[in-house]
Curated annotation (Swiss-Prot):
This is Chorismate synthase. Pathway: Metabolic intermediate biosynthesis; chorismate biosynthesis; chorismate from D-erythrose 4-phosphate and phosphoenolpyruvate: step 7/7. The gene is aroC. SUPFAM superfamilies: Chorismate synthase, AroC. Keywords: Amino-acid biosynthesis, Aromatic amino acid biosynthesis, FAD, Flavoprotein, FMN, Lyase, NADP. It comes from Paenarthrobacter aurescens (strain TC1).
Length: 399
């Protein structure tokens, strides 16, 4: 069983992630994690923080000489801006007079619409939003990307690879029927300003971001994650919480600012007749059982079917809007403009990288449940044995 947990605040000394249940023998280095975190900072329309924010990665346990050891893997992502926040975010009590001299410590009493600020203050009894936004911040996703790197490395050694890309920015959308990116296309994808696989659409997306920036607006969009090389049978139909699509949806909805998830053709399927909504099961000239379409996105009945997994996540426009939204100053009870420090115009490309990490964690957990071994070679043998045992052709069904 794969379990993971993160801790830390946006402006704290570091973020911490721990993942347990990783078999021995997964190839992992701090450089691979740094590369993944660098991808999280990609994207046209990002704010100033991406320019000065550096991710200092330290593997604290569970890895020796580039290989996992079978124990929990602990990763620390250090905050290079910590010296500026050391007094304000100190875990130990600080002299109030010292804090009073620091402008950064001004109480955040104007909660931002669309954020966790106000409800978090109500729930936990805070008189300002700082304690809420420090943990609710999307900065926490750096740890998820780090842990997702561990999961992705494990999956890769089993022949499973993931790709994420941007499908839409605001109303600018990749036309239906365009080719899907493959694992070999990741470098080219990451070089694109919006991580979009269609150049013409990418150019239109850049123009959309520029227009929003001039107008003091923010933009959302849709990202898609593809998983290649999955065997059939991950997940289960026997309970709702074991369904692979259920677990993927929960993981993606747990990403900050994600407001919708679909698997395969998703909501488009609801507008179709039944005869055009499903993937018929056929046989090819060799008698191999195949599906000519993949409208289901690689999942039927809560289980992977051996086709390409395809899931999408819709990200709302960033809630910290430069042209500040209306709110109430909780210290006075009077109408006010919401607090605004700095923000991105568009963070959809980064959301794709985070979504990719979350899908990797879910799939790694499902693989460990089905084929789990104490080491990578044992897991590989279990997977190979399973693949050899399931019918691939009509001649072998029932044997």
């Amino acid at each position: 069983m794969l379990r993971w947990l993160t801790a830390g605040e946006s402006h704290g000394p570091a973020l911490i992630g721990i993942v347990e249940g990783v078999p021995a023998g997964v190839e992992l280095t701090s450089g691979q994690i740094r590369d993944a975190l660098a991808r999280r900072r990609l994207g046209y329309g990002r704010g100033a923080r991406m320019k000065f924010e550096q991710d200092e990665v330290t593997i604290m346990g569970g890895v020796r000489h580039g290989l996992t050891q079978g124990g929990p893997v602990a990763i620390q992502v250090g905050n290079t801006e910590w010296p500026k926040w050391e007094q304000i975010m100190s875990a130990d009590p600080v002299d109030p007079e010292v804090l009073a001299d620091q402008a950064r410590n001004a109480p955040l009493t104007r909660p931002r619409p669309g954020h966790a600020d106000f409800t978090g203050m109500q729930k936990y009894g805070f008189d300002e939003a700082r304690p809420v936004l420090e943990r609710a911040s999307a900065r926490e996703t750096a740890t998820r990307v780090a842990l997702g790197t561990v999961a992705a490395q494990f999956l890769k050694q089993l022949g499973i690879e993931l790709v994420s890309h941007t499908v839409s920015i605001a109303s600018v959308t990749v036309p239906e029927g365009r080719p899907l990116p493959l694992p070999k296309d990741v470098i080219a994808l990451d070089a694109d300003p919006l991580r979009c696989f269609d150049r013409e659409t990418s150019n239109a997306m850049v123009a959309e971001v520029d227009a929003a920036h001039k107008e003091g607006e923010t933009l959302g969009g849709v990202v898609e994650v593809l998983a290649y090389g999955l065997p059939p049978g991950l997940g289960s139909y026997v309970h709702w919480d074991r369904r692979l699509d259920s677990r993927l949806a929960a993981a993606l909805m747990g990403i900050q600012a994600i407001k919708g998830v679909e698997v395969g053709d998703g909501f488009l399927t609801a507008a179709r007749r039944g005869s055009a909504a499903h993937d018929e099961i056929l046989k090819d000239e060799n008698g191999k059982i195949v599906r000519q379409t993949n409208r289901a996105g690689g999942i039927e009945g809560g289980m992977s079917i051996g086709e390409v997994l395809r899931v999408r996540a819709a990200m709302k426009p960033i809630a910290t809007v430069p042209r500040a939204l209306r709110t109430i100053d909780v210290s006075t009870g009077e109408p006010a403009k919401a607090h605004h420090q700095r923000s991105d115009v568009c963070a959809v490309p980064a959301a794709g990288v985070v979504a990719e990490a979350m899908v990797a964690l879910v799939l790694a957990e499902a693989v460990a449940e089905k084929f789990g071994g104490d080491s990578v070679p044992e897991t590989q043998r279990n997977l190979q044995s399973y693949l050899e045992s399931i019918p691939a052709t009509l001649d072998s069904v029932g044997r």
